[in-house]
């Protein structure tokens, strides 16, 4: 679980990166050709004409994802309750396999490390990794 120190580190780091969140989201979603290399992710976006990194739909959805993660930063004391509507959406309407959250979380960490090398210290890495795992768990809450 997230400690008070973890929460403080995540909030401070998010303050530094929030201006580039859309770019980070688009790159994370497109990293390693996530939507084409992992067949299980491709099925959720079959209605997009272009799944390539940098395409309009990938950029837009990456921004939406990072916007939701930004909101989650303010909900760290109750991620399950605060993200309940998103959990419902992903579990019941979109039927996203929660294993995909782990792939995306990894891609977000890699993208943050690339864009913010001096700020992405080991302490930040650990706190953000724990935070993204907590967000993933909150999103997967309705799957049980």
Curated annotation (Swiss-Prot):
InterPro entries recorded: Globin, Globin-like_sf, Globin/Proto, Hemoglobin_a-typ, Hemoglobin_oxygen_transport
Domain Globin intervals: 1-144
Domain of life from the UniProt record: Eukaryota
Molecular function, one GO term: haptoglobin binding
Metal-binding in keyword set: yes
Tissue/organ expression: Red blood cells.
Keywords attached to this entry: Acetylation, Heme, Iron, Metal-binding, Oxygen transport, Transport
Positions that bind O2: 61
GO CC terms in record: blood microparticle; haptoglobin-hemoglobin complex; hemoglobin complex
GO biological process: hydrogen peroxide catabolic process
Keyword flag RNA-binding: no
Location of N-acetylserine modifications: 1
Binding residue positions for heme b: 90
More about this protein: This hemoglobin has two more residues, 32-Asp-Lys-33, than other fish hemoglobins.
Family from the record: Belongs to the globin family.
Oligomer status and interactors: Heterotetramer of two alpha chains and two beta chains.
Protein role: Involved in oxygen transport from gills to the various peripheral tissues.
Protein name: Hemoglobin subunit alpha-1
Gene source species: Oncorhynchus mykiss
Gene: hba1
């Amino acid at each position: 679980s997230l400690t008070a120190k973890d929460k403080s580190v995540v909030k401070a780091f998010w303050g530094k990166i929030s201006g580039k969140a859309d770019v980070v989201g688009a790159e994370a979603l497109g990293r390693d050709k996530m939507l084409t290399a992992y067949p299980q992710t491709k099925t959720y976006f079959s209605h997009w004409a272009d799944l390539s990194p940098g395409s309009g739909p990938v950029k837009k959805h990456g921004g939406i994802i990072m916007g939701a993660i930004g909101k989650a930063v303010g909900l760290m004391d109750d991620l399950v309750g605060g993200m309940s509507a998103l959990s419902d959406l992903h579990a019941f309407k979109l039927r996203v396999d929660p294993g995909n959250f782990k792939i995306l979380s990894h891609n977000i960490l890699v993208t943050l490390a690339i864009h913010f090398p001096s700020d992405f210290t080991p302490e930040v890495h650990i706190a953000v990794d724990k935070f993204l795992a907590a967000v993933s768990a909150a999103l997967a809450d309705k799957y049980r």
